[in-house]
Curated annotation (Swiss-Prot):
Keyword line: Cell inner membrane, Cell membrane, Membrane, Transmembrane, Transmembrane helix, Transport
Places the protein is found: Cell inner membrane
InterPro entries: EmrB-like, MFS, MFS_dom, MFS_trans_sf, Multi-R_MdtD
Name of this chain's protein: Putative multidrug resistance protein MdtD
Record-annotated membrane-spanning stretches: 12-32, 49-69, 77-97, 102-124, 138-158, 165-185, 197-217, 225-245, 263-283, 286-306, 342-362, 396-416, 431-451
Lineage: Bacteria, Pseudomonadati, Pseudomonadota, Gammaproteobacteria, Enterobacterales
Amino acid sequence: MTDLPDSTRWQLWIVAFGFFMQSLDTTIVNTALPSMAQSLGESPLHMHMVIVSYVLTVAVMLPASGWLADKVGVRNIFFTAIVLFTLGSLFCALSGTLNELLLARALQGVGGAMMVPVGRLTVMKIVPREQYMAAMTFVTLPGQVGPLLGPALGGLLVEYASWHWIFLINIPVGIIGAIATLMLMPNYTMQTRRFDLSGFLLLAVGMAVLTLALDGSKGTGLSPLAITGLVAVGVVALVLYLLHARNNNRALFSLKLFRTRTFSLGLAGSFAGRIGSGMLPFMTPVFLQIGLGFSPFHAGLMMIPMVLGSMGMKRIVVQVVNRFGYRRVLVATTLGLSLVTLLFMTTALLGWYYVLPFVLFLQGMVNSTRFSSMNTLTLKDLPDNLASSGNSLLSMIMQLSMSIGVTIAGLLLGLFGSQHVSVDSSTTQTVFMYTWLSMAFIIALPAFIFARVPNDTHQNVAISRRKRSAQ
């Protein structure tokens, strides 16, 4: 990219800045949850909603981000995303109650939902096609560093300052990013078709109320009647979307996507698989601190091997899939992740703390292989005219399933521990043991979906098929 103009390189730095902010925020909060609970006078069982409110908002807003960027302009939307994210960070730091914090996290989520997809769109518009891959590698690298720094930085700030600083550090960064966006980024627009507002609202209502209903009486204090009503509203909203999208060329997500078998299987497997995987980044630092008595900083450091394992495995995923095929890889990694989850619980409860970094490194390797395989399986056979829509739907499902996973993890803690989870409680480790056993079972379930993937589905087979279809 050395032959790119200086202005373009600065624009890529701005996008990379946004990727870093968004990825850092998704991991820095996890380590701080026990301290937040103590500061706000809440049970740790309720703190999963701090993550859910952000991730669910991202899932809801993702479908609108690309259309808004084309309609209003990439600079205007990227600037708005940074401003909303920064304001949300400020309001998070100023929150005095859990409800205030949840609303502020939702505002952060609106900004986070627009930051990454609009950043990708910006790169497509400012960089020549032949340099697009190199440019995307450059801007996504900080996004890979964010999860590496997030847990340890969050623990460090909590231990030596306060949890408020995990949000306050976003403010100067956000101000610089917003000013740089206005000064340096061009405002590309495109002629757009009419936005499917009806479909967007139906999906948003369905996802939001079903997740809220899943949290149930343990997290929200809702009555059984209210929960039943939410489930009914959510199901009706999703059914209405299916009726709305049928034979509708302007639907937010075309039902024609599901005519491709690998897309249907991959999407179902991604949804179920990420529910299980979404539990782990939330539960691991909470367990280390509340269940084992680790300090926030120590718990954050323990998460680094998992990220390193994930980053290291990405280099050889393609060779693994080409050698063994999608079905074998996905079934093996799904069952393997379940076994590693049990291994982590066992070594932790036995007090073999020196083994935990190796177990977490292995967990990161297995999880990364499964994530990459799920993503490529889902999208690889889609025709070109449906590829963009399929990618957007997959991104939305990824965020939604992660929020559901965190919700279920909180629900399991509440189910086994009622309101008595604390470092001083004699039953705490028993509560976590039952929770981790349940998580391992849930993580293993998607293997039944992946077992239905055609046996000849390899990366190289898919490429040859795509070439034949293009001829």
